[in-house]
Amino acid sequence: MKEMNKFLLKVFMFFACFSAFNCIAVSASEADIADIFNSDGTPKEGSINGVKFISAKENGLLTLALFDGESIPNKSGDNYWFLSCNYYKDSYNMNAVICGAQRGEFKILLGSLGYIIEMENKPRGGGRYIVAFDKEPSFEATYRIFDKVQVKKFLAKMIDSKKMQYSYKNEKNKYISNERKIQNTGLTISLLKDMRDYY
């Protein structure tokens, strides 16, 4: 009977801890970020919709690298790209993570509200391009991602994107919306190559 009580106590403690963990996880708006980054910053390997990634923390910055298939990264960055997260609250509450990377003439930003690519100082339309990938775009003076989704979900949405949505300001100071099909959308790197070729 004594052994049975010990066993039941262990079971109760397990469920109590599990429930407490769930409460903590749910309280963070970006709970799924734990699937991508280790809280202690040590390197972590995984995949998002079949696209492999490695994440780590270096010099206080969280870094996420996504890889094109089985390719080994090269110095020119043709088969991988990075998101360097330059701000986060702490190891346990990373819901305010904002990541950014710059390649060529455009910046890649990853925040708690969504995923955007912003390109500045481009000649077309005389304005600044705000580019985003979504099924139901909303074009405003500043692009707004309408869904507050988890990091893993909008990364997956970006990887599976079928077309590029963008807006720009024309000569009459009016925002014009447009779109462009993305080929070979199953790979993140093809999206970036399309962007690089397009501009």
What are these regions (language model features)?
Residues 1-28:
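Classical Sec-dependent N-terminal signal peptides that target proteins to the secretory pathway
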Residues 25-199:
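A generic "folded-domain core" signal
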